[in-house]
Amino acid sequence: METGPRGCPSGRKESQEICSPGLLVFTGCSEQDANLAKQFWLGASMYPTTESQLVLTRGSSQRLPVARNSKVVLREKSSVQPFPFDQDKDAIIFAKAQRIQESEERAKYLQKAKTRDEILQLLRKQREERISKELISLPYKPKDKVPKSKEVLSESGLRDQEEVKALE
């Protein structure tokens, strides 16, 4: 079933009356399915969720605050600004915390690498033991026998051989 963005089944008289042909194509489905799909597409509408709709009223808090006098704003900014030493302390504390976190991650990855190496070493050891056991038991294993089905020819094969001998 091929569908377009909107529309209805094309190639039908009903669809040509309601919508332009070619917007929605239903191939390989029954007439009833096509009609139900057409009703769905004509009735479906995509409204935004209620959370995403903005409601603007006169007393709305969504509006921006009114600008104040620039002199008052400058005095407020100068009195509220922290000392530059506080910013440096914050940067130092942040850098230390970041270094500690990086060292913990590095230790975690080194531990994972060590575990991986141990697992690979164990697998190599088990493989070598398995190969050595197979080599020890190799002389005592029965050898593969040729299947009898290859040695015995079918009746048609025997007839063919007899006919060839008769021709000679």
Curated annotation (Swiss-Prot):
Subcellular location(s): the record lists: Cytoplasm; Cell projection, Cilium
Q: Where is this region: Disordered?
A: 142-168
UniProt keyword annotations, A-Z: Cell projection, Cilium biogenesis/degradation, Cytoplasm
Give an example GO biological process: flagellated sperm motility
Q: Where do the TM regions start and end?
A: none
KO phenotype (gene knockout): Male mice exhibit severe defects in spermatogenesis, leading to infertility and varying degrees of hydrocephalus. The epididymal ependymal cilia frequently show disorganized axonemes, reducing motility. Mutant testis shown lack of fully developed flagella in the lumen of the seminiferous tubules; the mutant spermatids elongate but do not maintain the axoneme, leading to severe destruction of the flagella. In contrast, the ultrastructures of motile cilia in the tracheal epithelia are intact.
Q: Which GO terms describe its cellular component?
A: cilium; cytoplasm
Tissue localization of expression: Specifically expressed in tissues with motile cilia and flagella, such as brain ependyma, lung, testis, and oviduct but not in whole brain, liver,kidney, spleen, and eyeball.
As a miscellaneous remark, the entry gives: Named Hoatz according to the Hydrocephalus and Oligo-Astheno-Terato-Zoospermia phenotype of Hoatz knockout mice.
Q: What does this protein do?
A: Required for motile ciliogenesis and flagellar genesis by mediating the maturation of the glycolytic enzyme ENO4.
Q: State the family it belongs to.
A: Belongs to the HOATZ family.
This one is known as: Cilia- and flagella-associated protein HOATZ
Organism of derivation: Mus musculus
